[in-house]
Amino acid sequence: MADLYLVRHGQTELNVQSILQGWHDSPLTARGREQALTARTAFAARGVAFDHVYSSPLGRARHTAELIVGEGRSIELVDDLREWHFGSLEGTSNREMPPQPWGDYPVAFGGESEVQLQSRMVAALSRIMARPQHDCVLAVSHGSVCQEFLEYVTGGGELPDNGAVLHFGYCDGAFSLLGW
């Protein structure tokens, strides 16, 4: 069984302000950088050595991945690991959004549906894990993406905190949750 460690990026300036980010970007806060370094320390203490590292191309995820694996390590940027696209809703206050689940709500604003998000994420992680010699993989992504993947694997899921690490097993094309 192969291991997939799916990490939500560290806290950002817009997280602190409760602003819906989507594909908009925002730098990590000091706390966000600390969350990434804490994950790095935890992986090292457990002897986890990644053979491949992937990240959303958005700066907050890429920076989190860089802090986790250190300088000089190759990180493959994968567009399909990006956050849920909310269209023109991006940049608005989370308080202005209806309660979750949002389903197709963002579609009316030029965004993608929840089904599209989950399909995109599952396909991306399945392609990654099906590659040869992918026994221990780090993928850094975003809150809604992690939540949707967790729901796909377990049938339910809540929004992981910034810096959260979700550990999945992958065998014969199927994922299982091993730890969170």
Each predicted region: which residue ranges?
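Glycine-rich phosphate-binding loop signature in dinucleotide/nucleotide-binding domains
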Residues: A45-A49, I128-C136
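Phosphate-coordination/substrate-recognition cap region in phosphate-metabolizing enzymes
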Residues: L37-P98
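Active-site catalytic microenvironments for nucleophilic, acid-base chemistry
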Residues: A42, L67, E71, R127, ...
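Short glycine/proline- and acidic residue-enriched helix-loop micro-motifs
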Residues: P98-Q116
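Generic beta-sheet signal
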Residues: L4, Q133-S144
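Domain-level recognition of soluble alpha/beta enzyme cores
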Residues: G155-W180
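Short, well-ordered beta-to-alpha junction loops that form the rim of enzyme active sites
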Residues: G10, S56-L58, D80, V140-S144
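Loop-to-helix element that buttresses phosphate recognition and phosphoryl-transfer chemistry
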Residues: L6-R62, G110-M121
